[in-house]
A protein has these predicted regions:
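A cross-family acyltransferase "interaction/gating" segment
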Residues: 27-43, 47-49, 74-169
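Accessory terminal regions of nucleic-acid processing enzymes
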Residues: 167-208
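Alpha-helix N-cap and loop-to-helix initiation/capping positions
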Residues: 57-61, 100-103
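Well-ordered alpha-helical segments embedded in enzymatic catalytic cores
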Residues: 6, 65, 111-114
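Extended interaction regions within the primary functional domain
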Residues: 14-15, 64, 146
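A Trp-anchored, charged/polar loop motif used as the substrate-binding/catalytic surface
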Residues: 58-71
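Catalytic core of membrane glycerolipid acyltransferases/transacylases, capturing the structured
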Residues: 1-56
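Hydrophobic helix-cap positions at the C-terminus of alpha-helices
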Residues: 10-11, 72-73, 118-119, 190
Length: 208
């Protein structure tokens, strides 16, 4: 939650309003579902492998439905936020994963691949953000009550077209195992660079 607030603060008035994909079922959550809908958050529908095994005629329909839902953004600026680890870092999660990274969980490629598949033609830049909390990861109340004295944010930018042209990502991601392996390897390399940066910051407390 604090990461979201930090990102909104850092990018306020610098990039289009940050949004993130939500499962279609969440539109029915009381109050929040209506708020997300009013704010034009994109809702996605994903079919599981077991569901598609029973209903093979629906293969690809989830992506088609999501692309149609995102058509409104062709004429409206948008930024899509994706937390690639998929969950908050805790030492117990890190240990269970046997993560090869000292400060991070393993990155999951599926979420960002879904965004690129659904909206790749509408997005221009990939903004890679690394957030470091020197005093330890704060709670929501720590942040809003002003008890967080120091936050370090590192930002790097890559053109989406560069990712596409280099073959790092292809639209066949969900059907081609080789594409998935190549994209995951690229993501792992970026995660290693993040981990090295966090290690350096922890060792030197050097401001970004």
């Amino acid at each position: 939650m604090v990461d979201i607030l930090v990102l909104q603060r850092v990018f306020n008035r610098k990039i289009p309003f940050l949004k993130f994909f939500l499962k279609k079922e969440l539109i029915y959550v009381p109050i929040l579902g209506l708020a997300w809908w009013a704010l034009d958050f994109p809702f996605m529908r994903r079919y599981s492998k077991s569901f598609l095994a029973k209903h093979p005629h629906l293969k690809g329909k989830d992506m088609e439905t999501t692309r149609k839902a995102c058509e409104k953004f062709r004429s409206k600026p948008v930024s899509i936020m994706n937390f690639v680890e998929g969950t908050r870092f805790t030492q117990s999660k890190h240990d269970r994963q046997a993560s090869p990274f000292a400060h991070l969980l393993k990155p999951k490629a599926g979420g960002i691949a879904f965004v690129l598949s659904a909206m790749g033609e509408q997005l221009h830049k990939l903004i890679d953000v690394t957030i470091d909390y020197p005093g330890g990861v704060p709670t929501f109340w720590d942040f809003v009550s002003g008890r967080v004295r120091d936050i370090r944010v590192n930002i790097s930018v890559m053109p989406i077209q560069e990712i596409m042209d280099s073959g790092i990502f292809q639209d066949t991601y969900f059907d081609d195992p080789q594409v998935r392996v190549r994209f995951q390897a690229w993501l792992n390399e970026r995660w290693q660079a993040k981990d090295n940066l966090l290690e350096e910051l922890n060792a030197t407390q050097k401001p970004l």
